[in-house]
Structure formats: C-alpha cells, structure tokens
Amino acid sequence: MELAVMSPVLNGMGTLEAALEYLHSLGVKSMELGAGGYPGKALMDPKEFLGKPEKIEALKALLAKYEMNICAIACHGNPVHPNKELAKDFHDQFVDAMKLAVELGVDTIIGFSGCPGDCEDSKNPNWVTCPWPSEFSEILEWQWNEVVIPYWKETVKIAEEIGIKKIALEMHPGFCVYNPASLLRLREAVGPMIGANFDPSHLFWQGMDPCEAIKVLAGAIYHFHAKDTKIDAANTAKNGVLDTKHYRNILDRSWVFRTVGYGHGKDVWNNIISTLKTVGYDGAISIEHEDDLMSSKEGVEKAVAFLKEVIIYEKAGEMWWA
C-alpha cells in the first residue's frame, strides 16, 4: 500500500509544484491528481498538456524532482446529467483526463457513475431512494437500462481505445452508484473495467460497515479514499440520516465529514486497512479532506500522521508459526 493525497485538497497552494514540494516535505510519495469535473483544474488542466510532448516530459520531470508517483487521475462529474450540455462537458473532461492519464503512465481514472433525471425531458438529476410509489421503481429502471448502462458501455469502449485499464467509480449518494450492490450491478452489466473508488465516509452514514462492504467488493476495489464521517447520535435519533442541511450546520446535522481519526478511532481504521489487505487490495490510500473544523493543511498533516501508523506497507512474510 502507499499513502497518497488527493490534489484538490491543495488547490489553494496555487501551483502543482508548490503542492508537490509540500507533500514531499511530509514524506508523501503519491498523489491522486485532480484534472477536471468537480475536483476542478486548479493544479492540472489536461488541455494544456495533451498533444504537447515537451510539456508532458516537463511534467514528468517535475514529478521526478519531488519523487512523486501519480496513483490515479480524478475527474468526478455527472456525465449522464439531464442537461445535455452539462453532460457533454463532464464527458469531454473525463475523456481528456483519461488521455492525460495514459500519457503519464497512469492506468486508473476516478469518477462518479452520474445520475440522470426521471425522463428524457428532465432538467435536473433525480436520485431514487425508495421503491414506492411505483413510479420511483419505474424511474430507477429507466435510468439504469436507458441511460446509465448504455453510457458506461460506450465510455468503457473509449477507455479501452485510449489505454485505460481501470475506471474507479466512487460510491456516492446522489448518484446511481452509491453502495456495493449498485456498483456491482453496473460492473456486471458493463464489464470488469468498472470497479470501486472505495470511500468509507459515504458508507458510514448510510449505516454500512466498511469492512463488510470491502469483502463484498473483493477484486473490484481499484482505489481508496481516506476520509472519515462523524455520526451525531442525537440528531440521527431525531431525524435519521437523510440530511439536506448545509455541511456547515455542524450542530444540527446528523453527520459530517471529518479528517480520518476524528469520526472513528484507530481500531476502526486498522480493521479497514487490514480488510483491504485481506481481499488483495495493495494500492493507494488517498487522503481527501472535507473537514469544516480544520484547515486543509492541518487536516492533511493530521491525516498523514494518523495513516502512517495504520497503513500496512510491506508484504507479509512466511507464516513461520504455522
């Protein structure tokens, strides 16, 4: 396993080199590079590099200068948005990000499954969370069979032509893929290029046990986000977990995102890392900071210190005791 940081956390540093220098000073040797979509292009805009071999070589030299590996390219978006212009923009950015990944020797691209509307004439996405009244079940089947599955079948073909090996979709509420069952549904329909970007922060508040979810997804986990969630037991007892209050309304929300260790303790994270290792995942553990109680810098540094104690870096030796 390797410790990584998702670059949008460091967008405020202004330049990619400043972010690389900072991570190098922390002993971090891997970066998840944001290059479009919701992560933005503050530190990396693929269009500035694609078709320009000299700029690609300069970028590789910059990464080598700070001993930095790019573990994946992040370009989360909603490529099946009912607004066709938005959908095309998200799709085009995703394709550019895939092309950049291959130029840099990176085989994994990260995104969202997306969420369509409820019909061809919709203006906004419609995330279905219940089967009744029956219209919701009908909407869900239309979304999957007419939009999501066809879109990803075509996008996988494009990815294969470009040279991408893995599409790691983040299981995120608000999108059609939001838990292991929906991730596996898409994977079974489209093929093994589709896998999970496993972010336990989105599973904690839905009531899932990340370790059990990891077991269900064994062999289909292509990336991992290290982000925590703090559940407010009192607010959850009163209002449940479907909470639309702003994330800054910490006192009244049922849950909020936290830096690793501030939602769940070391034992929980030890078990998550151990379960990942058990199912054969040996890739990046990428820090994502969305904690409104501390700065990005403090959050990253606390997460780095915490995870250095938790991550299993080496392969297990011979079982000499058995």
Model-found features: residue ranges?
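Acidic/histidine-rich catalytic cores of soluble enzymes
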Residues: 2-5, 13, 30-31, 73, ...
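A short, acidic, flexible beta-alpha connecting loop/helix-capping segment that sits on the rim
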Residues: 10-11, 286-295
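Short, acidic/polar
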Residues: 12-23, 88-98, 206-214, 269-272
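Catalytic domains of carbohydrate-active enzymes, especially glycoside hydrolases
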Residues: 18-38
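Active-site acidic/histidine proton-transfer and metal-coordination neighborhood
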Residues: 21, 58-66, 79-195, 270
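A structural motif
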Residues: 28, 101, 106, 164, ...
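Glycine-rich, proline-tolerant flexible connector loops at the mouths of alpha/beta enzymes
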Residues: 33-58, 114-120
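C-terminal helical cap(s) of enzyme catalytic domains, especially alpha/beta-barrels
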Residues: 296-316
